[in-house]
């Protein structure tokens, strides 16, 4: 941790030996900038489409159950949870988090940092949290079966649990928990919804150029050419406003699976994934591809 220009900056350093010397990766956390961004962070700014935003808000206002956010590393999962905490943080409820690391401190929220050297793991921390009379719990990440089991039991016993797990889409989450040996009945009984997300770059509005996409490119993207052949497309160019990159900022695209009774019954019956996906889309789910 360093003080630079009256700012507190944290550095997470990972060093790995290689045949050509040490490979170093540094993650920079500007806490003052994060504080400014998070203080103004609302779910509307994440990038939800209106229907997914409405459904996600409904899920995080339920008194109990589990809300799962999934995606690869660096897809904005923690930012989404922080936006949810900003809306959930009221005087009526006691909210406790366990994170690795705590990237931003919320007023009125009990936040616990993971410290494996001192024995504070996600699983042990979560067990301790349950003895502190929480109403809502945020678990930074589910990494093992023990943490998953405790989180599920917490959701089944009257707590709202928000957490993340690494998976490619909303349906892979089910397989991920199954691979941990988690009982499907309890897992589905606890689960309110699954949100999958990705971060995409935004074309610089100052220099983006209008182009006509080629048929091969449209089809390679998994889109129907006849449907999108007249759609205007833009591409990055680069200017002084975006430092020649062609992009300015990022936004989130989402895929929201509401665990309705019909979806749960299909999963319990081990119906093919294609049928479950078709049912979810019929119920209004917008996929990441869409």
Q: Which positions does each model-derived feature cover?
A:
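Short, flexible helix-loop junctions that flank or precede catalytic/ligand sites
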Residues: 1-290
């Amino acid at each position: 941790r360093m003080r630079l220009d009256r700012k507190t900056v944290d550095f997470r350093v990972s060093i790995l030996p290689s045949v050509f010397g040490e490979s170093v990766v540094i993650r920079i956390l500007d806490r003052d900038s994060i504080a400014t961004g998070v203080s103004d962070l609302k779910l509307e700014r994440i990038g939800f489409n209106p229907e997914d935003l409405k459904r996600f808000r409904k899920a995080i206002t339920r008194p109990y159950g589990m809300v799962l956010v999934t995606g690869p590393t660096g897809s904005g999962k923690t930012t989404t949870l922080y936006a949810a905490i900003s809306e959930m943080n009221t005087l009526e409820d006691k909210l406790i988090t366990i994170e690795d690391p705590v990237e931003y401190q919320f007023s009125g929220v009990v936040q616990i940092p993971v410290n494996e050297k001192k024995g504070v793991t996600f699983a042990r921390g979560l067990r301790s949290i349950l003895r502190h009379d929480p109403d809502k719990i945020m678990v930074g990440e589910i990494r093992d079966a023990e943490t998953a089991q405790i989180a599920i039991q917490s959701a089944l016993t009257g707590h709202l649990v928000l957490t993340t797990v690494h998976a490619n889409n909303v349906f892979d989450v089910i397989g991920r928990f199954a691979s941990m040996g988690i009982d499907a009945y309890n897992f589905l009984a606890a689960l309110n919804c699954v949100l999958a997300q990705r971060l995409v770059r935004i074309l610089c509005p100052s220099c983006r150029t209008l182009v006509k996409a080629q048929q091969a490119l449209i089809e390679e993207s998994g889109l129907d050419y006849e449907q999108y052949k007249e759609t205007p497309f833009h591409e990055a160019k680069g200017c002084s406003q975006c430092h020649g990159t062609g992009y300015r900022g990022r936004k989130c695209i989402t895929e929201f699976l509401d665990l309705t009774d019909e979806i749960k019954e299909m999963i319990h019956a081990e119906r093919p994934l294609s049928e479950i996906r078709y049912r979810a889309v019929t119920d209004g789910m917008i996929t990441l591809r869409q």
